[in-house]
């Protein structure tokens, strides 16, 4: 869930994400954590692929392809990712498609890694969460779809919140879909937001979604202008503006 979405207590939702000491969210993105993050990633990959200690390279990692839509910034990100992976022996090719073709390819799940982006048109974290239910037209990761339908790798325990829900090694439909449905019917604000944090925890535990950056909306506004409003989609509203002299 991106910056700007508020939590039940009025704080930012992302500030309360994850369950880590010393940093916000699911990854420590500080400069001081770079080396330890790198080492953790290498050690994780060593469990599954052959690593040559003398060269610092993986020798049998499958070739990846990064799919992105036309745009210089998207291309630059892909080039950086490809370069960073090449440094440890992982080949990631780049594939550029125009927008409509890109959307269809991604929706069909015909990719190994693909760029994605999302904007919320209202201030509620559910806008970033319900898109990943099995039946969602935006579920391009293919959670619970096709060959992933019967993957039983997810766990969910909501008994501490008063729900008779405890699933071990369940499918996406038995876990994530369930918690999103509960969010949509919950009338208690504190419980509803806690359910959304649990949903995000489950989503991020899959490792299928890797946030790179948040969009920003830069503009200049003179101190004399009052009543200006900019919504989450970047639209600017001046109809209630006044200028103090």
Task: Please state what every model-predicted region is.
Residues 5-8, 70-74, 99-101, 119-123, ...:
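Solvent-exposed loop/turn segments at secondary-structure junctions
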Residues 1, 47-70, 114-117, 169-221:
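Bilobed periplasmic-binding protein-like "clamshell/Venus-flytrap" ligand-binding domains
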Residues 38, 68-81:
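Bilobed "Venus flytrap"/periplasmic-binding protein-like clamshell domains
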């Amino acid at each position: 869930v991106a910056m700007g979405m508020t939590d039940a207590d009025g704080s930012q939702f992302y500030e309360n994400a994850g369950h880590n000491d010393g940093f916000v969210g699911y990854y420590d993105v500080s400069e001081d954590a770079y080396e330890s993050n790198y080492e953790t990633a290498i050690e994780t990959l060593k469990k599954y692929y052959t690593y040559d200690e003398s060269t610092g390279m993986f020798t049998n990692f499958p070739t990846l392809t990064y799919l992105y839509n036309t745009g210089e910034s998207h291309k630059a990100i892909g080039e950086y990712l490809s370069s960073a992976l090449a440094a440890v022996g992982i080949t990631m090719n780049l594939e550029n498609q125009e927008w409509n073709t890109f959307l269809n390819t991604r929706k069909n799940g015909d990719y190994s890694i693909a760029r994605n982006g999302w904007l919320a048109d209202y201030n509620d974290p559910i806008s970033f969460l319900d898109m990943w239910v099995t039946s969602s037209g935006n579920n391009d990761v293919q959670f619970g779809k096709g060959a992933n339908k019967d993957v039983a790798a997810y766990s969910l325990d909501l008994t501490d919140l008063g729900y008779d829900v405890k699933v071990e090694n369940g499918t996406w439909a038995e876990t994530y879909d369930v918690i999103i449905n509960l969010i949509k019917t919950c009338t208690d604000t504190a419980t509803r937001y806690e359910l959304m944090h649990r949903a995000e925890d489950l989503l991020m535990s899959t490792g299928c979604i890797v946030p790179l950056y948040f969009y920003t909306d830069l503009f200049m506004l003179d101190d004399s202008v009052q009543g200006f409003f900019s919504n989450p989609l970047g639209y600017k509203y001046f109809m209630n503006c006044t200028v103090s002299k």
